[in-house]
Amino acid sequence: MTTVHNLGFPRIGAKRELKFACEAYWRGEIDQTQLDKTAHTLRANHWQTQLDAGVEWLPVGDFSYYDHVLDTSFLVGNIPVRAQADGQSKLDTYFKVARGTAKEAAGASCCGGSHAAEMTKWFDTNYHYLVPELNANTHFKLNASKLLTELEQARALTSKVKPVILGPLSYLWLAKITDGSTHKLGFLDDLITVYRELLGTLAKEAVEWVQFDEPILALDLPEQWQHAFERVYHQLQLPNLSVLLATYFGPLDTNLRLAARLPTAALHLDITRGGDDLPRVLDILSPHKILSVGVIDGRNIWKADLNKLLAQLKPVKERLGNGLWLAPSCSLLHTPVDLDSEEALDADIKNWLAFAKQKLQELNILQRALDNGETSVAEALVHNAGAIAARKASAKVNNAKVQSLVNNISPSLSERESPFATRIEKQQAKYNLPTLPTTTIGSFPQTSEIRKNRKAFKSGEISQQQYDRTLRAEIAHAIELQEKIGIDVLVHGEAERNDMVEYFGEQLDGYVFTQFGWVQSYGSRCVKPPIIFGDVSRPRKITVDWAEYAQSLTSKPVKGMLTGPITMLQWSFVRDDQPRKITAQQIALALRSEVNDLEAAGITIIQVDEPALREGLPLRKKDWQNYLDWAVEAFKISTAGVGDTTQIHTHMCYAEFNDIIQAIADLDADVITIETSRSNMELLSAFEQFNYPNDIGPGVYDIHSPNIPATEQVVGLIKKAAENLPLQRLWINPDCGLKTRKWEDVIPALENMVNAAKQLRAEVA
C-alpha cells in the first residue's frame, strides 16, 4: 500500500485562534493554563483533520507558539542568557527571546530589559524564523518536555505518530555566531550528542519514525557541510527508530546523491520545485529505502492536476511498490487551513483552489488511485480534470489588452530621465531638508477604532461617506502628531489599509481575496495573501485621493506609499500557469500608472516598498541573475516614469544585502530605507564596501519589539552608521512600518529618534 504522511500542518488555526490567544496572554488577559488549553484544542483539531483526510503518520512537534526554529533552540537548550531570569516560567522565557521585553528596572541597559532575537526569512518564503545564537558559552542540553507532551496527546488519537524536528545541520546553518567563535560546524559535536540523546528518548517512548528536516540540502553547500551530513547521519542511527530525512523548497541537484546515500530509512523530495530529481533518485536510491514524494505543492493554493500527477507517479509506484510514500512538498504551514470556510469566493475561482485540508484530500485521491486503480476514484478525477480545464479557458484569467501591453514593453520604460547625481541636486534644491532628515516607513498604529470602522464599513453598517470621514480624521491626527514631533518627511499613516499587499490587490483586476485565507508570517503576525488568478491591471486610481488630502494639511512633504511589484508578487499566491516574470511586469505597469498619477497630483516623494526583493531569489546562485534582472526591471518600470525632482524611495527589511547589492543599486531609488537595528547596523557593511551611491536610511530602532529606544541608543546607532556611510547621505527612520505598535509606544520612540537626529545635527553644525 502507498503511505500518505504530512510534513506539518498550519498552527495558527482556521480563524487565527492561536494568534488571539497569544496576544491575550501577552496583554495579561489570560494565564498560561488558558493559553495551553487553546493550543491543546488546536492540535487535537488539526490532527483529527489530517486523520480524516487519510494521513497515516501524524506529524508531532510542528505546532509552535511562535516559531519552530525557536522551539528547536529550546529543545537543544540554546537559550540566550539575557532572556533567563529567576522565577520566570519557561513560556515567558520563550516569549522573551522572541519578542524582547521593555526596560523593567533602573539598572537595565539603555536599550531596555532584553532585546529580541534577530528575525529573518525562512529560505525563499514569507515566513520569518528567529535566528539561533552561537557563541563561546554555547552548550547544548536536551529539553524534550514540549515534544513529549505533544507526543502523548497525539497518541490519544493514533499510535502512528512522527515527531518532526529541524535537523542539526540546518539548525546550525541558520544560526548566527555572535562573537569571534569558531566556524558553525565547531558546535556540531556538542549538538549531535543532544540529538542522539533525543533519539534515545524517543526510542524509549516506542516512537517508530522521526522526521528530520534538512532544507539546506536544496542550497549550494560547501564541501565541508556535505561531509558533515555523512558524519552526522551515520551517528543518528538507532536500531528500532527509523529516520525520514525531509528536504524541500527546491531540487537537490548536486546534493541528491549525498542525500540518497545517507543511512536513513526514508528520503523526502519536493518534486513540485525539483521535478528533475525524481527520475534521478530512482536510479541511485537504495532498494530498501523509502522514497517520500512531495507531489502536492505545500506553498501555493492551486488545485493539483491529479491526472497528470498519476501519469508521473504510476511508474514510480510500479518500481517502488510499498516503498512509495506521498506527502505535500513541504509543511503546509505556508497555506491557509480550509477552503470550505470560504463562503464569498467566486465559485469558478474557488473550484480552482486547494488549501491545507484539501491538499491532504488530493493526496488521498492519488493514494487510492495508485493502490486500487483509477476507477475507484473516477468521479474525483473527472471533477479535477474539469476544474483544470475550466481555469485554463476562463475569460476571467485572460485579458488581451494587458497581454499586449506586456508584449510591447521597451527598455526606455525602465530608465529615469537623468542619473542620480543630477536628480539629487534638483531634489535638495526643491525640498531643502536638513542633514539627517527624519521620516517613517509608512504605516502608523492600526487602532481598535480603525479596525472597528473598517469592519463596520465592510459589513455595510456605515456608508462609504461615513467611513471616509473616519479615515480623514485618522490622517489628520497622524499629520498633526508628526508635525508636533518634528519629523521632516511625513506619511499619511495608511489608516485605510488592512495590509500592504491586500489593499492594493483589492483594487487591481486579476486579484481575488479570501475571508479566512490566513497564513503565519511570524509569531502572532498573520497575513491573508491575495490570490493572483488572472492578468493584472489597474481600473482606477488607488492611493491618490488619500495622499492629496494628507498633503493639503501640511507644508511639509508627504510621501506617497505604494507596495512594489516584486513584493506584490512574493506576498501573494501567484498563478502558476505563466512565468512569474510576466505577472511581475503586469503589476509593474499597473503601479506605474499610480506613480504617475501621484506625481501629477503634487505628491513628489513616492515610496515603493520592496521588502520581498531578496526573498524571491532562487535557492541556487546559478539562477539568481535571471531573477534579479527581471525583478529590477519590474521595479524600474513602476518608478521610472517621473521627473527628476520627484524623489523615489524604497524600503527593504529582514535581508542580507551583500550578495545582491548590485541589484539594489540597479533599482536606482533615490533613497532606500532598510532594517538594520536588530543586526546592530551590521547590514550596512554591504553598502559601505560597495560604495552605494544613493541616499540610505538605516533603521535606528526595532519596531517588532516592545522596547522604546532611548535617545542615546539611537545616537549610537546613527554614529555607527556614519562610520560606514557619509553623513549627508543618511536618513533617520525606524526599521519598518508602525502598524502593529501602540501610539503610547510609537510617540516616545519617534520623539527620541527625532531628538537623536537634532543632537547629531548640532554636533556637526
Curated annotation (Swiss-Prot):
Entries under InterPro entries matching the protein: Cbl-indep_Met_Synth_N (IPR013215), Cobalamin-indep_Met_synthase (IPR006276), Met_Synth_C/arc (IPR002629), UROD/MetE-like_sf (IPR038071)
Cofactor annotation comment: Binds 1 zinc ion per subunit.
Name of the protein: 5-methyltetrahydropteroyltriglutamate--homocysteine methyltransferase
Any Gene Ontology biological process: methionine biosynthetic process
Residue numbers binding Zn(2+): H651, C653, E675, C736
Native organism: Saccharophagus degradans (strain 2-40 / ATCC 43961 / DSM 17024)
Active site: H704
Catalysis performed (reactions): 5-methyltetrahydropteroyltri-L-glutamate + L-homocysteine = tetrahydropteroyltri-L-glutamate + L-methionine
SUPFAM superfamilies: UROD/MetE-like
